[in-house]
UniProtKB/Swiss-Prot annotation:
Co-factor: note: Binds 1 zinc ion.
PANTHER family xref list: ENDORIBONUCLEASE YBEY, CHLOROPLASTIC
Biological process, per Gene Ontology: rRNA processing
Upper classification of the organism: Bacteria, Bacillati, Bacillota, Clostridia, Thermoanaerobacterales
Cofactor(s) essential for the protein: Zn(2+)
Keywords linked to the UniProt accession: Cytoplasm, Endonuclease, Hydrolase, Metal-binding, Nuclease, Ribosome biogenesis, rRNA processing, Zinc
Task performed by this protein: Single strand-specific metallo-endoribonuclease involved in late-stage 70S ribosome quality control and in maturation of the 3' terminus of the 16S rRNA.
Family affiliation: Belongs to the endoribonuclease YbeY family.
HAMAP family found in the cross-reference section: Endoribonucl_YbeY
Name under which the protein is recorded: Endoribonuclease YbeY
One example GO MF annotation: metalloendopeptidase activity
Amino acid sequence: MNVLIDNRQTKVDASGLEALVVRAIKATLEEEEVVDEVEVSVSFVDNEEIRKLNKYYRGIDSSTDVLSFPLMEFEEIEEGEEDEKDAEEIYPIGDIVISLEKAKEQAEEYGHSFEREVAYLTVHSMLHLLGYDHETEEERKLMREKEEKVMERLGLRR
């Protein structure tokens, strides 16, 4: 597993978050029984930067907490022919962009730690990269159950 982390903001102290994000990504992959080597890029930004990205990619002119950019349908990895796969091959599955500024605001609003919020946003985004969504009530419920299992695995229950 390769995790590339880029702190592109200066408003919130990101000390110690790299290890937490890597743990959250690893726990999500383990919970989903992903055995392939994957690469994930994570960027920490502020509210203004994520607002610009949200407007450009989703047409929504407001800040948000996290954006997920899958690079492939995860089924493409699972359906590849086993004998054609190089054991050393690493699959880049996507990019995660987290507004640390928004994460800090939400942690205060929800009454839990900043670290728990960043871990949750990472898990939520990883599930999107793995093909989950929350467009329907059924999808939302399934995704929430998955999030809770991973957060429990991390010891970060509500």
